[in-house]
Design a protein with these regions (language model features):
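An acidic, low-aromatic, low-complexity terminal/linker signal
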Residues: 1-180
């Protein structure tokens, strides 16, 4: 590098004013918040789990039945990557009919916290998605009543709107399933 290319060039009045104006503008304090979700399909329905609440997504595993537990939503317990998780039928908890298709695309979405994990089988997980909070809409009243309490809003996706899962409400319902 030559000495001439290292010396700063003098700024003309117009460039100086443009840079001064750019630095004088206040920094945007409230940027558009992106909501990151894990998109999943159960039957023909698309659902979105808040990515921050998803511990992991793995290939589907066969759970081990829990003796003396008869609630149809409790599928059993499974060892998922070295951690025991209660496997719960998402559709049964939410009040709609669905049977896992299985196959190569089937996945387990694991929610909760370490030591208190809950796994849900889904037909597929195409990936994660970042959505502007402004693009999310409230769940319409037409969302069927049995599982309306588990949907906190709708997330626009290329597959159509996906129901954003209220993880706290879902896990509270799952705890009730285990107790019965």
């Amino acid at each position: 590098m030559s000495e001439a290319s290292r010396t700063p060039r003098p700024l003309d009045a117009q460039t100086l004013q443009q840079q001064t104006d750019a630095f004088a503008r206040p920094v945007e304090t409230q940027r558009k918040q992106d909501v990151h979700v894990v998109l999943a399909r159960i039957g023909s329905s698309w659902i979105a789990f808040p990515a921050a609440r998803v511990l992991r997504v793995t290939t589907a595993v066969v759970p081990h039945r829990v003796p003396h537990r008869r609630h149809r939503a409790l599928c059993g317990l499974a060892n998922i990557e070295g951690e025991i998780a209660a496997v719960v039928d998402f559709a049964s908890v939410c009040g709609f009919d669905w049977s896992p298709a299985g196959g190569a695309r089937a996945r387990m979405v694991v929610l909760g916290e370490r030591g208190s994990a809950w796994a849900f089988e889904v037909d597929e997980v195409p990936g994660t998605l970042a959505v502007s909070a402004e693009d999310m809409v409230a769940a319409p009243v037409t969302v069927s009543t049995p599982h309306a309490g588990f949907t906190s809003g709708l997330v626009p996706t290329e597959h159509g709107p996906a129901g954003m899962v209220d993880v706290d409400a879902l896990l509270t319902a799952c705890e009730g399933v285990v107790r019965t």
